[in-house]
Amino acid sequence: MKASERLLKYAVIYTGSDEDHAEQTPSTPEQMTLAQVLAKDMRDIGLTDVSVDAHAYVYGFLPATADREQCPPIGFIAHIDIVNEFGTSEIHPQIVKEYDGGEIALGTSGRTLDTVQFPDLKQAIGKTVITTDGTTVLGADDKAGVAEILT
């Protein structure tokens, strides 16, 4: 599975933080739901000893490459909670294929992205860009990291 496919799979699972329960981890049941999905995906790609603890921390292990067992281990860490900005739990990713460098309308929300406000968009010309439809956050800072780690 490609990282973009994983991002789309994970993005639609709403994991907004609940400020009323900020003292507990996870602060919402949906965060545990995504943790369970991640654990399954980790098992599916061959990680071993995969587990999810009571706080929605997901652990998995990948054995060292043969003849590299002496190398130091490495760990990858990412979080799965997102901001709760729009007060809705329905996340609608939007895919722009072969981005042409112009303004990207975020669905019918009236919001847009452009290279004046976001100059880094110029690097995406000709590529696929994944955004929200403008009615919610995408949560890509968290979930794209997780998707990349598992790809």
Predicted regions and their residues:
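A non-catalytic alpha/beta surface segment that caps or lines the substrate-entry region
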Residues: 22-71, 75
